[in-house]
Each structure stands twice: as C-alpha cells, then as structure tokens.
Amino acid sequence: VAYVKAAEREEQIVAAAITEFSEKGVPGTTLRAVAGRAGIPLGTLHYVFPSKDQLLRAVIMAVIREISDALRAELEVDKGLEHALRHGVGSFWNKLVTSRVGLQIMQYELMTYSLRSDSDGGLAQLQYERYSALVTEFFERAAQAAGERCAVGFDTLGRIALAQVDGLILQYIAKPDLDRARRDLNHALDMLVLYADPQSVERTKPLNAETA
C-alpha cells in the first residue's frame, strides 16, 4: 500500500465526508460510510479523526476555505465595498448555491446536528463565528483597499449580510427558482449597499490651517 502523508489523508477523508454528507445528510451518515467513500479502512479514519465531532469541525473549516475562495474569485479588492458585496456574494451564489444545493443543506444540518447533540452547541457557534468573521474581514479589506469608510461596523454588516444570504438560500432550497432567487439576491444586495453607505475617506486640513 502506498504511503500517504497525514495532511493528504485528512484532505481525502474530509472531501469524502463532504460528498457523503451532501448526498445522504449529516445525521444519517456514519464514519463507516465516510471511510467507504474515501476508500480506506475504518480504522484509518478513526486514527485521523477519533470522533465524528472532530471530522465535522474539519468539514466546516474546509467549507469555509471554499467559501473564501468563491468570494475572492476574480475580485478586484481596490474597487471598493459595493463591488465586493455585489461581485463577491454573487460569485459565491453562482458557485456554491445554485450548483451545490446538497452542500448548502449539509451546512444547515451541521448547525442543527450540533444544537441537538451538543449541550452548548459548540459546533454551531464555531460554524457561524467563522462564517461571520470571514465575511466581515472580506468587506473590511475591500473598503480599506479602496480608501472607503462604512456607515456601520464591519462586524454588523457581516452578520446582517450572512443572515440575508442564509434566508435566501433556505428559500431557494425549499423551492428552487433561479430567476426569483437572482432578483431577490440583487434586491438584498441593494439594501446592504444602502445600509453600508460606503464613502471615500478624504483627508481634511486641520481647523487652524490657513490658505496661502
């Protein structure tokens, strides 16, 4: 049997888990099924991920990296916050929502699974804290690169943007309609742009400065 590096084996298992969870659902998927999907013995999976919770955490982090890549794809950060909102969120929707419905269902199942199985809902908190931090950092970087300020805190903007997109995803999952979803997403982005009200930051002269 060919030797596989630990990092590669972990990626292999996580990719198999995402596929299995997306197709079969989080609650009903066993570690044995994930091992079978990855083409490895169950003992190997247990060695890499001793518990299902550890595997789910790795899955969440992998999905976050994928979302980050989708947000940043072909994005020109110095074009400002409005561009980041419209282009970044639009790119995410096209790449990870309309063509990956199973992935979106999996993410909601991860949250509800955690809330049902963990007394403190730690996995659900991790999931949304990381999502919110990712979106917040994305917006803040875009504004700073373009020399803009935002009318509200970037953390607030990130949470509200996440809430709006989550709601639209749930509607799309329940009743897929590409045209309606795209219209609603554009309306939501219009509202977010108005709420953020990005403006260029201009250097102002000191009050005691005199004109020559």
Which residue ranges define each predicted feature?
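Short, basic, alpha-helical segments at the C-terminal edge of helix-turn-helix-like DNA-binding modules
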Residues: 61-67
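Short alpha-helical functional segments enriched in proximate histidine and acidic residues
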Residues: 20, 66, 134, 138
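Hydrophobic alpha-helical connector segments
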Residues: 58, 72-104, 154-161
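Conserved short hydrophobic patches within well-ordered secondary structure
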Residues: 42, 107-111
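Helix-turn-helix
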Residues: 9-12, 16-54, 58
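Hydrophobic/aromatic-rich alpha-helical bundle segments in the mid-to-C-terminal region
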Residues: 119-125, 142-212
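Amphipathic alpha-helical packing segments from all-alpha helical-bundle domains
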Residues: 98, 102-105, 118-144, 156
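Short loop-to-helix capping motifs
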Residues: 51, 113-118
